[in-house]
From Swiss-Prot:
It holds the Pfam family Cytochrom_C550. This is Photosystem II extrinsic protein V. It comes from Microcystis aeruginosa. GO terms for molecular function: electron transfer activity; heme binding; iron ion binding. Its main location: membrane. The lineage of its organism: Bacteria, Bacillati, Cyanobacteriota, Cyanophyceae, Oscillatoriophycideae.
Length: 135
């Protein structure tokens, strides 16, 4: 992916600070997302719960909000339910449980960073990202 700085600048944290990715980070994140996440999250939709997508609006309404890079990294390490009440580490793939999710065993910290970063860039690349699922 060859993207401009505006497209590659994403929100870093809850304080609203931003970070600008490299095209290489976005490309690597996309590859890893496709390889590891699209089984349930094709185009940012959620196969197991059509009411919650990976669109920025839905991520912002999660508890805690997941619409920034550090919050998404936290989710990929320690997933919780949308309302933040339940630990989903045994139900949702994550890097903290390689005993349950061996397919994620070899992901590095940089890989997790790039996947989370791609999830924040993706809505700018595909207007259908996180959209409605039609049957």
């Amino acid at each position: 992916l060859e993207l401009d700085e505006k497209t590659l600048t994403i929100t870093l944290n809850d304080a609203g600070e931003s970070v600008t990715l490299t095209s290489e980070q976005a490309t690597e994140g996309q590859k890893l997302f496709v390889a590891n996440c699209t089984k349930c999250h094709l185009q940012g939709k959620t196969k197991t719960n059509n009411n919650v997508s990976l669109g920025l609006g839905d991520l912002a309404k999660a508890e805690p909000p997941r619409d920034n890079l550090l919050a998404l990294i936290d989710y990929l390490e320690h997933p919780t339910s949308y309302d933040g009440e339940d630990d989903l580490s045994e139900l949702h793939p994550n890097v903290s449980r390689p005993d349950i999710y061996p397919e994620l065993r070899n992901l590095t910290e940089d890989d997790v960073y790039n996947v989370a970063a791609y999830m924040l860039v993706a809505p700018r690349l595909d207007e259908r990202w996180g959209g409605t699922i039609y049957f």
